[in-house]
Amino acid sequence: MKISFHGQSCIKIITGNTTILVDPFISGNEKCDLKAEEQMPDFIVLSHGHDDHVGDTVEIAKNSGATVICNADLASFLAVEDGLENIAPMHIGGKRQFDFGQVKLTQAFHGSQTVRDGRIINLGFPTGIVFTIEGKNIYFAGDTGLFSDMKLIGELNPLDVAFLPIGDNFTMGPEDAAIAARFLQAKLVIPMHYNTFPLIEQDPHQFVASLDEGISGKVLEIGEGIEI
């Protein structure tokens, strides 16, 4: 399995013949190396409804026929407002089997809304995501602050990789993310959600250096991937 990072919180997972895009904020994202019109994933997974995470989901899903996995409130919105048909609605605490493996949604402390035609629309609770693929557990925290139940996430799902936001202001910053890494006890921690906008400028290498002894961290450059 290969996991690659594409700026902000966009990651791509390739397992066998299946491609999964997570939070595909591509258009308007100067930090992203992808082109929306070239993406043909089998699945798109969304952590919440903010525009910098839903991103190009509708265009990509309509072009590719990808199944969109997200919380049920966001799923309803995408179906009714944007005409998406291949949607797998879920909610926090639930898990579901797909051809590629299992998806489980966890809590995240953040918001989830959009503005459409002058209306502010709530799109359900934000989530984190635990993927179980090829016997490996990958935790994608989404946008969140630090919370103590991250310990429970790590206990219930021994983690091989954890993607954690470090940008501060809208999510936890590097200091809290280092505590999150301690709580989760993942084998590898990868920072995300930083340097896309001035308000979330951070040094990811400094974050990795701040991790507790025994916790491995890695900064993925834009477009770079790892094999696990």
Curated annotation (Swiss-Prot):
Keywords: Hydrolase
Coiled coil (UniProt feature): none
Record carries keyword Hydrolase: yes
A GO molecular function held by the record: hydrolase activity
The keyword Hydrolase appears for this protein: yes
A Pfam match: Lactamase_B_2
Family listed: Belongs to the UPF0173 family.
HAMAP family according to UniProt: UPF0173
PANTHER family for the chain: UPF0173 METAL-DEPENDENT HYDROLASE MJ1163, UPF0173 METAL-DEPENDENT HYDROLASE MJ1163-RELATED
Protein name according to UniProt: UPF0173 metal-dependent hydrolase lin1612
Organism: Listeria innocua serovar 6a (strain ATCC BAA-680 / CLIP 11262)
